[in-house]
Amino acid sequence: MKCLILAAGYATRLYPLTENFPKPLLKVGEKTILDWLVDDIDTLNVVDEFVVISNHKFAHHFEGWAATKVQKITVVDDGTDTNETRLGAVKDIQFAIEKLQLTDDMLVIAGDNVLDFSLTKFMQYALEKGISCIMRYFEPEAKKLSKSGVITLGDGDEVLEMAEKPAVPASNWCCPPFYYYTAEDAQLVRKGIESGCGTDAPGSYIAWLCRQTAVHAMEMPGKRYDIGNLESYEKVKAEYNGITK
């Protein structure tokens, strides 16, 4: 299995902190955001390579970080230099798949979230299901729902529909940017793009994929900290106690 880490954004809402430094390498406690994610995922011993998808501006920072790690980490530079010219998450996924000629199952995650639970729980869930899977959590606030990916559930965790940033949310189930694609479904990303799925938000591909094949959603067993602005970063630094579940 490969783990694709989406890290090509420019984090403009965190300026000046991230004007010349990538958000995924900011420290939370004693480790960087990426360290928390990679070190946790690695404990299950099913990922044989981590692929960090970066923009050109920050690629050298990720290369320097990768050189300090014991895991096999490949940094892919998507060639963009500005927020205005960014490819978007789905196109970045496709760029990495084609550049590295990846044919494996994939864990695809955002590089700017920390969790208080181990992602290995989600990986085990997906491997047992044997199909593409996502995670979900209950969000009571309509304002937050309208800024997220929202799913409609059927029986047995099946995802019937997903919408990114819906004006009228169909449910209270939010989908965070942590996905498992089977090898077969990972090869359909280009088809999804060509069929008109959105390319900026990473969940746009899942919104298309769940209409083509079965996708299941595991309820998150803990809390996710999304670092979107300076205020949320300071809050995470004050509250986060590591992976406790």
Residue map of PLM features:
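Short acidic-glycine loop/turn motifs at beta-strand connectors
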Residues: 152-158
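Conserved donor-nucleotide/metal-binding helix-loop-beta segment in metal-dependent transferases, i.e.
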Residues: 117-146
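A short, conserved beta-strand element in the Rossmann-like catalytic core
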Residues: 113-116, 224
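Alpha-helical elements of Rossmann-like donor-binding domains used by nucleotide-donor carbohydrate transfer enzymes
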Residues: 61, 91-95, 121, 204-205, ...
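Residue-level signal for inorganic ion chemistry
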Residues: 34, 96, 112, 151, ...
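Conserved N-terminal catalytic core of the sugar/cofactor nucleotidyltransferase
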Residues: 2-5, 13, 27, 31-108
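Active-site metal-binding loops of divalent metal-dependent hydrolases
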Residues: 10, 112-113
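Catalytic-core segments of class I nucleotidyltransferases/pyrophosphorylases
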Residues: 123-127, 158-226, 230-245
